[in-house]
Amino acid sequence: MYHLHPCETLRQVFAARPFQGAEPERASFIFVGLDANYSPDIEHSAIFPQLLEYLSDGVAFWRKTGVHHPFLLPAYGNKDGAKYHRAFASIGFRPEHAPLVSFVELLHLPTYGQSKLAVGDLDAVHLRWVDRVIRAGSARYVFIPGSVASRMRQSGCFPWLPREPESEGGSLGVWQRTTTTTVYCHYHLSTHGWQEKKKREQIAEIRALVKDA
């Protein structure tokens, strides 16, 4: 179950480009999530114009502002989503990496509140597109948390995705490795507590991949 975001403008912009950042088909780094979640009153936020600008052209936004997401703008403060994007920023991507980085969600619609996605909530056409992006696009590195991978397996649209990632000795697990693309398993970037140490180790390993990009 999910709560469809009430802002019509946000829904329209997201429908035209159901991803965030660079075009996924051309990106080298793809981060797969469950849904794009926003505050229910985001339309009245000081950063709403910048959010629409970002969703319309994430690459241009990053180059213009120096931050990869409007939730990192000072006017947004410490509201929902800021923690995730601060953790993401610690990876070390810079504005010149903007054309290489994309965020793709399993749900094709923007949401608000707490989502508990079931397979029936997901659109098969969108999921097949996600599969093509991962397996037939330009991605060198794809990052899928375990909770997201679980929904992907349940959908039946990703038969290549194993039940458990392989360990290659580092903190990142590996869902799949081909001659062109490595699909990694990592902790969600908003996790904390006992997962924090390993999450930081995983971020350091992703940072090393960025240096080679």
Task: List where the protein language model places each region.
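A polyanion-binding, active-site-adjacent surface
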Residues: M1-S138, S147
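Extended, charge-rich low-complexity interaction segments
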Residues: I134-V142, D212-A213
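C-terminal capping/extension of enzyme domains
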Residues: M1-L10, A118-D131, S150-A213
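Acidic, glycine-rich loop-and-strand cores that form catalytic or ligand-binding grooves
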Residues: R140-Y141, P145-R153
